[in-house]
Amino acid sequence: MSQTDILYACVSYKGVCLVEHKIANGNFIDLARRLITKIPPTSKKIYTSENHNFHYISENDLAFLCLCHEKLGVQIPSEFLSDIRQQFIRSYGQSFSQNSPTATYDPFIRVLEERMKYYSNPKSNKMNLVMDQVSEAKGALTDAIEKTIHRGEKIEIIVDKTERLQSESFVFKSNSVALKRKLWWQNKKLAIAIGLVVCILIAVITLALLKYFKVI
């Protein structure tokens, strides 16, 4: 038994112990059983006794408690309690009866034993910390890559729109030049036609006047 061991863990409902596991004997078991009768329906606290800490969390009268040396700190016991809480609710739900047979929850003793060993192993704790840091860094990197790709897609959309506008502008300019030339030629032909009509009218009027004055 070392100072990194979780010595005792239990799950209780309304002050009644449903399941527990220990790796050592001592008066701490009686102390833990008295303590669970005083845990508020919803709470999170640390109770200290002779260099050891009782850590507990409770919600809706369902409490999870563990005992360990004070040198183990706060983070690891807190993670342990959150872990067994999730597994217990996953296994048994959130509705309980104080009259349920004690044996109902006996299979969870193996879960407590396994998780106590896991969180009591310093190497596992350090590995968990490293893995969490790696996972966090990986998540941040993934988010950064996704944002970069998203920005890249926006840039590509802007470039495509710019190229399309340039193309449309060129087509519009070409069409404008062609239309201008067409209108110029139509105006030219109209001017020529008007000129011819005017010349013909002048010729007709001139001939009429000459005949009137009997010049011809």
Curated annotation (Swiss-Prot):
Vesicular-side segments: 211-216
Transmembrane intervals: 190-210
Domain Longin stretches: 6-112
Membrane association type: Single-pass type IV membrane protein
Location in or out of the cell: Cytoplasmic vesicle, Secretory vesicle membrane; Golgi apparatus, trans-Golgi network membrane; Late endosome membrane; Lysosome membrane
Coiled coil location: none
Membership in a protein family: Belongs to the synaptobrevin family.
Cited function: Involved in the targeting and/or fusion of transport vesicles to their target membrane during transport of proteins from the early endosome to the lysosome. Required for heterotypic fusion of late endosomes with lysosomes and homotypic lysosomal fusion. Required for calcium regulated lysosomal exocytosis.
The protein, known as: Vesicle-associated membrane protein 7A
Organism: Dictyostelium discoideum
Gene that this sequence comes from: vamp7A
